[in-house]
Amino acid sequence: MDVGVIGVGVMGRNHVRIYSELKSVDSLGIFDVNADAAKALGEKHGATVYGSISELLDNSDAVSVVVPTQFHSTVVGEVFKKKRSVLIEKPICATSAEAEQLMKGAPEGIIVGVGHIERFNPIVSEIKKIVKNPLYVEMKRHNPTSARVTGSSVVEDLMIHDIDILLNEFFLHPHDIHSVGNADVMSVLMNCNNIPVVLSASRKASKKIRLFYIEDEDFTIEGDFMTQEVTIHRKPGQYQIEAQRYVQENIIEKVMVGKVEPLKQELETFIDCVKNQSPFPVTPEQAIRNLEFCEKVRAAH
């Protein structure tokens, strides 16, 4: 299959690197408005550099769109005109209204997916298998200050990863949304089936954190998106008396997780979906709902 990447910033370079390693990719093309950056990357990974998006599309069966969010609508619109399958980096557009308008122009017969990368992190499926009766859920996604400019608030930039997992893998209809924060730091409390769920995201942290924490009826689950480790803390069911204090010793279990690079899983899945004409796991409809929820979060504080 002939694949292209439009946009070779931080994330786009990773798309190029992985596509260049996939046996299912016959040829790889790239385009970026920064011609020098595109040329250097093309030489590094054996990719053909094209002078325009149109030229790239003429030589591609499917493309990744990895340009800044504010340009998604324009660039993806060009892809739709050429009727090429496309993987759009998250968020799908700057606003849910813009995304809905964009998708009205999607032609039939192509695959359209959205790159919510953490959906492909193996800890998500492992935790989903373990959870039985959740009592409390918390997800933290904190970043140190970065020079990378996204044009989005911390909600659409970082928290949207956890929103995507929450809405599409665990709870369909959160309500009673309360949020506190600003463009760079946000905390949200919501009600999911009478379960308190807390999300927090920051672009001002001193430490990078990617945590998933669930208190279940009989155990507590801790998942780390970065190390791809899942730990279960179980109650032994009995207490010991020690120096006039009740002491409970938990039983700790490490869950065996098959570690993978989530982006590689995502891109391999996209290629397979295009080949087999099957829906990509993260649909535009889900991505739009994620954005709508982000907008609710920002409006709730």
Give the label of every model feature segment.
Residues I160-E229, H233, V257-N276:
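Contiguous beta-strand/loop segments that form the cofactor/metal-binding neighborhood of enzyme cores
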Residues G51, I88-E89, V112-V114, G223:
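Hydrophobic residues in well-ordered beta-strands that form the structural core
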Residues H15, H45-M103:
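Beta-loop-alpha module in the N-terminal Rossmann-like domain of NAD(P)-dependent dehydrogenases
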Residues L28, D61, L135:
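Conserved acidic residues
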Residues M1-K44:
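N-terminal Rossmann-like dinucleotide-binding module
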Residues A62-V67, T269-H301:
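C-terminal helix-rich "cap/oligomerization" subdomain common to oxidoreductases
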Residues G115-P122, P144-H175, Q286-A287:
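Mid-domain beta-loop-alpha active-site segment that forms a flexible
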